Structures are given as structure tokens and as C-alpha cells.
Amino acid sequence: NLQTKELDATNKEKVNAFAASVNEIDVLFHAVGFVHHGTIMDCDSEEFYRSINVNVYSAYLMSSTLLPTMLKKKQGNIIIVSSAASNVKGAPNRFIYGTTKAALNGFVKAMAVDYVKDGIRCNAILPGTVETPSWHERVNMADDPKQARIDFINRQAMGRLAQPEE
């Protein structure tokens, strides 16, 4: 049985209520993200904390709340969606986004080694850019939208933008 749930993954009470509503969980697929655009000089403390809260704290809260159910069964999968912006090369104008997604990669590695012997697998998916309405908005705000689109595509390992349905 596949069950999906949309909830504010930064809200401890809502996450606890969700955890209480499920008897068991086999897979946590955590796809949460907030993209702040710009360099360190463009990122004020409010955007910094929002990015940490949405991109990192939510993964901690969901994983730490649902992990005990998996540990009881001695099996489970935690899959965290990170980003190609977290890689060593980085991505231009993605200071805090890339930073938080890199933190998620460390988070996943630490959980993986801590719980693999308990039957829990932890992995990260690092997708490239997904062509969404917010992506179109961002590109259209560029000085040269056509060139911005080309630049985005050139940074993608697969030579194109990912589609939401993928």
C-alpha cells in the first residue's frame, strides 16, 4: 500500500501526528526544498534560517520521528532528495541552497552508517534542475532569459532539464 502525505515537515506537532496515524512505515521519501537564489551577500539571516529549517531540519524531524518504527521491524528505507547543486563544483547563485543540500548529503551518509546493521537503508537522490513553473519564473527574470535557459541546460548531466513527472 502506497500512502503519500503532504504536510509541513518543519512542524513537530504535525509530524508527530502523522507518525501516530501510521502503524508502520517501510519507506520515507523526503522531497522537501526551498531554493533561495543568490550569493552569500544576497542571503539575509531570515532566508538563511528558512533554508536550514526547510531543507535540513525537516529531514531530521521526519527521519528521527519515523525511524523508531523502522527499527522495530529491523527494516526500512529513508530516501532524501538532495540536489546536484550540492556537489563539489557547486552551482552559481545557489549559496544557501547548495550549502543546505550538501548538509543533507552528510546527514544521509551518517544515518546510513549508523543504521545499516539494523536493516535500515539511507540514500540520497541528487537530481539536476527540474523544469517547473518556479524555474520558468526564475529564468524569465534573467537579463537574457534565452541564455539563462541554455546555461541551465549545459549544467545538466543528462543534457536537458528534468521534468516533474520524472
Functional labels for PLM-detected ranges:
Residues P68, V113-D114:
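Alpha-helical segment proximal to the catalytic Tyr-Lys
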Residues P127-E137:
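Short, flexible catalytic-loop segment of classical short-chain dehydrogenase/reductase
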Residues S63, T100, V108:
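Active-site helix of classical SDR
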Residues S83:
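Residue(s) in the substrate-gating loop at a strand-loop-helix junction
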Residues V32-H36:
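Conserved NAD(P)H cofactor-binding loop of Rossmann-fold oxidoreductase domains
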